[in-house]
């Protein structure tokens, strides 16, 4: 029986793991991989203490920190997928791809995952020119014309990455104004190989064996237009990874875990959540880490009081 099971190893899970080890709680951290969503970022400039760090380097630093913190109280298992969490009397059962674990408390730091395109051609050309990971697939389209769907920070960061080796990058966004930070927008749009199409809707994706183009609707003119591209990189938002606790704790209308912002407690005693899987107003790496530490401090007191 564990005192605590931490699910996820992004900034939140990693921070909680370090603090749990220091408090000598019998803890196991379960994760599919390290790093969270930021693992795909080429240049992270707002992780405190690092003026610039890549997503892969950040993920590796998380892993190394946990390895350093590990002792006889903290266990880490990578490559494990959590399927379901259920209440079992005065404790919880965590069913995973690597077996079932019993614990007195659970901290969910699973973050969120990419929302997929839902237009004609999106399923047909998934992994055939449509990608949700520029770091993984971008180099395959060096010297090609490509498109990015989404006008948030993730969309512009993806465009910046692709501009390093693609012939041209066209970014399509559904609103007249962008959600990304202004400094990021200005920097990316200043590149001569960068094109932007705000206030448009993606209509469909065309191709034969692979993507050859897309059709979009220009809201200003009311006309549909075609754009020839050989790849489409989608950055259209995220879906919280909370399937394992559906029916166990309260979720909001969008599937995020509702928590008490003072303690990060979920609706069921013994369950805490932190980071992008929660209904917190802001989702950032540094916030996820802070929220997870807050949760850890609270659950430590909870355990000691029992």
Features from the language model and the residues they span:
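A Rossmann-like FAD-binding core segment of flavoenzymes
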Residues: 66-96, 100-103, 164-261, 301-305
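Phosphate-coordination loops involved in phosphoryl transfer and adenosine-cofactor binding
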Residues: 1-3, 79, 127, 142-144, ...
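Rossmann-like nucleotide/phosphate-binding core characteristic of flavoprotein oxidoreductases
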Residues: 1-7, 19-25, 215-219, 225-231, ...
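Residue-level detector of alpha-helix initiation sites
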Residues: 10-11, 112-114, 153-154, 279
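Beta1-alpha1 glycine-rich phosphate/pyrophosphate-binding loop at the start
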Residues: 2-74, 144, 156-182, 252
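Redox-cofactor binding/interface segments in oxidoreductases and associated redox assembly factors
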Residues: 7, 108-109, 148, 234
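Glycine/small-residue-rich loop that forms an oxyanion/phosphate-binding "nest" at active or ligand-binding sites
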Residues: 76-142, 151
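FAD-site-proximal beta/loop scaffold in flavoenzymes
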Residues: 113, 118, 124-140, 236-283, ...
């Amino acid at each position: 029986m564990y005192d605590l099971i931490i699910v996820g190893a992004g900034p939140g899970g990693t921070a909680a793991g370090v603090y749990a080890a220091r408090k000598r709680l019998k803890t196991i951290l379960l994760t599919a991989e390290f790093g969270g969503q930021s693992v795909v970022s080429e240049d992270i400039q707002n992780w405190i203490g690092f003026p610039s760090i890549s997503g892969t380097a950040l993920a590796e630093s998380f892993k190394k920190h946990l390895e350093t913190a590990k002792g006889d109280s903290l266990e880490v298992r990578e490559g494990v997928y959590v399927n379901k969490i259920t209440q079992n009397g005065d404790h919880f059962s965590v069913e995973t791809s690597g077996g079932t674990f019993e614990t007195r408390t659970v901290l969910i730091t699973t973050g969120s995952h990419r929302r997929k395109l839902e237009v004609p051609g999106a399923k047909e050309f998934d992994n055939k020119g449509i990608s949700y990971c520029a770091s993984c697939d971008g180099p395959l389209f060096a010297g090609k014309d490509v498109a990015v769907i989404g006008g948030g920070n993730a969309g512009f960061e993806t465009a910046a990455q692709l501009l390093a080796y693609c012939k041209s990058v066209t970014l399509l966004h559904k609103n007249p104004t962008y959600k990304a930070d202004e400094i990021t927008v200005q920097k990316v749009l200043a590149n001569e190989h960068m094109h932007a199409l705000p206030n448009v809707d993606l209509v469909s994706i065309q191709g034969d064996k692979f993507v050859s183009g897309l059709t979009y609707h220009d809201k200003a003119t009311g006309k549909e237009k075609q754009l020839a591209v050989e790849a489409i990189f989608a950055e259209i938002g995220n879906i919280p990874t909370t399937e394992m606790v559906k029916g166990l704790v309260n979720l909001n209308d969008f599937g995020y875990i509702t928590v008490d912002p003072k303690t990060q407690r979920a609706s069921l005693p013994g369950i805490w959540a932190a980071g992008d899987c929660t209904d917190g107003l802001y989702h950032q790496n540094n916030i996820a880490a802070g929220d997870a530490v807050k949760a850890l401090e609270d659950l430590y007191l909870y355990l000691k009081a029992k």
